[in-house]
């Protein structure tokens, strides 16, 4: 194999590996996001939204000092799909039951395929005009943990 063919071979494999594994690496360590409105704070962190996952999971916490947190997240949360036209409802919730001032749990969804460039989770609370929106760009190099190594 001559030098040019060796370089082509190497470049093809590097590009192929980046295409195959790049999105998984970026989706592995997405930041927690929070939203405060009406005295209720909602914090969401993706746990697993990788390309190989059949189920996507999000760690969700709700906190307030002023009201009862009776939200049924399986009925009020959804992911907006690629076309933005259909809402994907949760597959389940494992965590604290409705009620009280602090709730934590894992909200799960059937994974979207193919993996979108971004994920948008919305939670519509009773009495609030608009849903809370949490969005993560999966194809952004800013999500690569290697970019933030200290």
What is each stretch, according to the model?
Residues 84-135:
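Short, solvent-exposed, Trp/other aromatic-anchored flexible loops in extracytoplasmic proteins
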Residues 27-77, 147:
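N-terminal secretory signal peptides
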Residues 26-29, 47-50, 94, 125, ...:
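Beta-rich carbohydrate-recognition modules and glycan-binding surfaces
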Residues 135-150:
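Short beta-strand elements
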Residues 22-24:
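N-terminal signal peptide c-region/cleavage motif recognized by signal peptidases
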Residues 48, 52, 65-86, 122, ...:
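Long, contiguous binding/interaction regions
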Residues 15-20:
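Hydrophobic core
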Residues 2-14:
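Bacterial N-terminal signal peptides that target proteins for export
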